Swiss-Prot record:
PANTHER family: LD18447P. The modification N5-methylglutamine is found at Q233. SMART domains: PCRF. GO terms for cellular component: cytoplasm. It comes from Clostridium botulinum (strain Hall / ATCC 3502 / NCTC 13319 / Type A). HAMAP family: Rel_fac_1. Peptide chain release factor 1 directs the termination of translation in response to the peptide chain termination codons UAG and UAA. One of its GO terms (molecular function) is translation release factor activity, codon specific. This is Peptide chain release factor 1.
Length: 358
């Protein structure tokens, strides 16, 4: 590990020199790329330097203990040695996590697709609850949310809805939300007070660059139609809504949020690319998952990941056995406690993988 950290520190110094070189700054595209690489290494280098400083201080205190005869100074040195030993253990753990393989999609913006599952109108209302939860979470993170498409019901639910979430680290946090979400509650329409179970499916897709995936124009069928709002009423007098069908896979994407047909087409193409990219990534991850049966989650949208129990005010994440009794605030976007636990578990699994490789 130390050899790798020394290499990273040297690379960081090299990048520091490059990004301050006027000749490199003249090429803005290259300069921005180097600045990002420099920023990505900064936390590792700073932590490593703190680790080296603690090591030096520890050796200094040990030397003092050998040479010093004053009782008070020896006690001070012994106390410092204890503190520095614990600090070095913490920093070593932190460095191990920082050196874990990074998900190349973590810095990307995302599309969140929410679809009502089993449960009819109640499932559609739950899909609406989930959309609000992610919207409120995005607000807490100062991320931007844009509606791409929606299929609303007459009483405020959604059969399906797609939104774009743009902001730093959006995918790194939201990627753990893919899967089947289950709700247990008494519907407003239930006169007998019986608890119903309904589901909604969430898919979180990283927005991909043109270089990540190529689409042949001949593989697309593009239809235009008039946009509709809640309950199906027409909200536009021109054919601005766009439906794109990817013929080889049968994937269909719609977008009706913008008044401009061109903008709707651009947004729909971004979603289509994200879906095709996800399909390719899922195929690749399937073989890896065979060796990681206990992993936090495959991101498979058929995997039941969480239950929201209204009578008990309880949320249970089935992947890690986490139970929280804060349903109201959770649905208001306070979901970081669950996400942090999932991140920690994911890191532990990656560390196990590294151990198997080594």
């Amino acid at each position: 590990m130390l050899e790798r950290l020394n290499f990273i520190e040297n690379k960081y110094e090299e990048l520091s020199n490059k990004i301050s070189d006027p000749s490199v700054m003249a090429n803005q595209k290259e300069w921005q790329k180097l600045c990002k690489e420099h920023a990505d290494l900064e936390i590792i280098v700073n932590t490593y330097r703190e680790y080296k400083k603690a090591q030096e201080d520890l050796e200094s205190d040990k030397e003092m203990l050998k040479e010093e005869s004053d009782k008070e100074l020896r006690e001070m040195a012994q106390e410092e040695i204890k503190e520095l030993t614990l600090k070095l253990e913490d920093l070593e753990r932190e460095l191990t996590i920082l050196l874990l393989p990074k998900d190349p999609n973590d810095d990307k913006d995302v599309f969140i697709e929410i679809r009502a599952g089993a449960g009819g109108e109640e499932a559609a209302l739950f899909a609406s609850n989930l959309l609000r939860m992610y919207t409120r979470y995005a607000e807490r993170k100062n991320w931007k949310v844009e509606t791409i498409s929606l299929n609303a019901t007459d009483i405020g639910g959604f059969k399906e809805v797609t939104v774009a979430v743009k902001g730093k680290g959006a995918y790194s946090r939201l990627k753990y939300e893919s899967g089947v979400h289950r709700v247990q509650r008494v519907p407003d329409t239930e006169s007998s007070g019986r608890i119903h179970t309904s589901t909604a499916t969430v898919a979180v897709l990283p927005e991909v660059d043109d270089v990540d995936i190529n689409i042949n124009a001949n593989d697309l069928r593009i239809d235009v139609y008039r946009a509709s709002g809640h309950g199906g009423q027409c909200v536009n007098t021109t054919d601005s809504a766009v439906r794109i069908t990817h013929l080889p896979t049968g994937l269909v994407v719609t977008c009706q949020d913008e008044k401009s047909q061109l903008k709707n087409k651009e947004k729909a193409m971004k979603v289509l690319k994200a879906r095709l990219f996800e399909a390719a990534e899922a195929e690749r991850a399937a073989s890896i998952a065979e060796d990681r049966k206990s992993q936090v989650g495959t991101g498979d949208r058929s995997e039941r990941i969480r239950t929201y129990n209204y009578p008990q005010g309880r949320i249970t994440d089935h992947r890690i056995g986490l139970t929280l009794y804060k349903l109201e605030t959770f649905l208001d976007g306070d979901i970081d406690e669950a996400i942090e636990a999932l991140v920690t578990e994911d890191q532990a699994e990656k560390m196990k993988d590294l151990g198997r490789v080594n």
